[in-house]
């Protein structure tokens, strides 16, 4: 059974198309107009082994906030759609990823309940190119709200802002991959004692 999610979201501020195949090979086609964000979404697809298409046309003449936020909302909705009934998945996933001096620890529960815990080093450089580093938390908040997952992201240390953000996306990719993969020992079984996710 295909596990593909496709979401189109259009407002006065942005037009977003996201398509994700959870059982892909990591092929990506990303264009948001925000170079560093494209790089992070590429990491998400490649390291999650998700085939991921993202096309966003936003009001970048103002700034990148709406473009980044609306893309994350659509991505979360597409991920949730692709999960389907969640029967037979592992449900939980975690991964720790280093990037030189930085380290990210990510744990996810595909619980149907949105919750985010996010910590990263203080006093990071405020910008990476045109990317405002404070948007990383907002991306995660937006994704969690639509994907309906509990997500814990912890960066205990790091110096380089690029590395700090990138290792979060790589660890998120792997954690989502592990949680959404099918468990051969649980075929046909919903991973919940209450019978609903």
Curated annotation (Swiss-Prot):
Pathway: Amino-acid biosynthesis; L-histidine biosynthesis; L-histidine from 5-phospho-alpha-D-ribose 1-diphosphate: step 6/9. Its EC number is 4.2.1.19. It comes from the Bacteria. It is found in: Cytoplasm. Keywords: Amino-acid biosynthesis, Cytoplasm, Histidine biosynthesis, Lyase. It holds the Pfam family IGPD. Its main location: cytoplasm. GO terms for molecular function: imidazoleglycerol-phosphate dehydratase activity. It catalyses: D-erythro-1-(imidazol-4-yl)glycerol 3-phosphate = 3-(imidazol-4-yl)-2-oxopropyl phosphate + H2O. GO terms for biological process: L-histidine biosynthetic process. GO terms for cellular component: cytoplasm. Belongs to the imidazoleglycerol-phosphate dehydratase family. This is Imidazoleglycerol-phosphate dehydratase. It comes from Streptomyces coelicolor (strain ATCC BAA-471 / A3(2) / M145). The gene is hisB.
């Amino acid at each position: 059974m295909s596990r593909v999610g496709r979401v189109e979201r259009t407002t006065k501020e942005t037009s977003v198309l996201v398509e994700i195949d959870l059982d892909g090979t990591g092929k990506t086609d990303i264009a948001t107009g925000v170079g560093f964000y494209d790089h992070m979404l590429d990491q998400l697809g490649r390291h999650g082994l998700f085939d991921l298409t993202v096309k966003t046309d936003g009001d970048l003449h103002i700034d990148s906030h709406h473009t980044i936020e609306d893309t994350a909302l659509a991505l979360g909705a597409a991920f949730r759609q692709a999960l389907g009934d969640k029967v037979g998945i592992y449900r939980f996933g975690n991964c720790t990823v280093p990037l030189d001096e930085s380290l990210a620890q990510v744990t996810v529960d595909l619980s149907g309940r949105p919750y985010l815990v996010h910590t990263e080093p203080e006093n990071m450089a405020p910008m990476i190119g045109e990317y405002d580093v404070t948007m990383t938390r907002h991306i995660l908040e937006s994704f969690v709200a639509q994907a309906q997952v509990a997500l814990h992201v912890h960066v205990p240390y790091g110096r380089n802002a690029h590395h700090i953000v990138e290792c979060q996306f790589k660890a998120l990719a792997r954690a989502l991959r592990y949680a959404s993969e099918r468990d051969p020992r649980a075929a046909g079984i919903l991973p919940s004692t209450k019978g609903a996710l």
